Every structure is written in C-alpha cells, then in structure tokens.
Design a protein with these regions (language model features):
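Non-catalytic macromolecular-recognition regions in eukaryotic signaling proteins
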Residues: 1-179
Length: 179
C-alpha cells in the first residue's frame, strides 16, 4: 500500500506485486497465469498488439499487460473513530469509500474489441456482480471528509477474494477535510 502526498485521502495498492502474472511469467507463475486465463475465458486472444522490443515504451517498464492475481468480490473499510453520525467507530464505511483503478475484464468479455483498459469507479459497497477482475491498477479514496471526520484513523481494510480468502490490512492514516 502507498499513500499519495498530493492526495492524502488516497490509498494506492502495489502490494499485489508479488501476485502479478503475465504471458511472460516463468515456472509456477506461468502455471498460475494459464489458470487465470482459463478461469476468465481468456484463451482466444490471437494477435500481438505490441512487439516485445517495444514493450518498454508503453509505460516505461515491461509490466504492460500484467494483472493482479486476485479477483475481489467484497471490500470493506472500518475505522476506529467516528466518521460521521451515520458511521460510528467500528462500522462499515462502504458507502463513503470509493474504489478506482483499471481492468482488462470488460475487454475480455467483449471478445477483445474496443479499448483494452476499462476505468473502474464506484463505492466499495457496490462492487460489480462479477467482482473486480483482471486488475491492472487499484486504489481506494475518501472523496468527502468532513472537518469532524478529519484526523488520524486506524483503518482495517478487508478484501474478500472470489475463492473466499480474506486479506486484511491495518493502516494508520491521516484524513484531511475535503475542500
């Protein structure tokens, strides 16, 4: 996880880096990549969009078409402090915290037509029915923080993977009031 000094109410997730899979993965990661392709019915792609020697020019590194190794079906964030009257300490902030990111999932579902990357944006209590899949990037954001809710919060962030696995992270974060 990383915090953004330019947006203090933003949490970026790069902790997935150890669970990242691509067509050029090796060994066990290559096998997991193949499993993910079958799981997402992503087995018919038949064209190269960029030459391997040009891959570094896309995003400045060779991580162009890599995805995180988890599909999320539920996310929750809980604070040890009151957020507002409707969100006392210890209750879900699901209708307050937004998720965002980029995904290849819609591209695969469309049969590889249109833009390969879809933008994700929504509240964490309203994740799409088929989950958050084939993520290229992912973040959480507190878009509206009142003066009363600003300050240091000890957050518990829960991710539920589609196989039922729960990933729990604890983070101390200073939330600044929205403008």
């Amino acid at each position: 996880m990383k915090l953004n000094p330019n947006n203090p109410n933003f949490i970026g997730f790069d902790w997935f880096a150890g669970d990242e899979y691509a067509y050029d993965s090796k060994g066990e990661n290559k096998e997991r990549y193949k499993e993910l392709c079958v799981k997402h019915n992503d087995t018919n792609y038949d064209r190269r969009e960029i030459k391997p020697e040009d891959a570094l020019g896309i995003n400045g590194d060779a991580r162009y078409r890599r995805v995180f190794g988890h599909d999320f079906v539920e996310i929750d964030v809980i604070s040890d402090r009151d957020f507002d009257d409707a969100h006392p300490a210890g209750t879900s902030l699901g209708d307050v915290v937004k998720y965002g990111g980029k995904s290849y999932w819609e591209y695969v579902k469309r049969g590889y037509t249109g833009n390969p990357v879809s933008e994700l944006d929504g509240y964490i209590n309203n994740i799409p029915e088929d989950g958050l899949c084939l993520l290229k990037s992912f973040w959480l954001n507190f878009p509206e923080v009142s003066v009363e809710a600003s300050g240091t919060h000890n957050l518990q962030i829960l991710f539920v993977v589609d196989d039922g696995t729960e990933l729990v992270f604890n983070l101390t974060m200073y939330l600044e009031p929205s403008n």
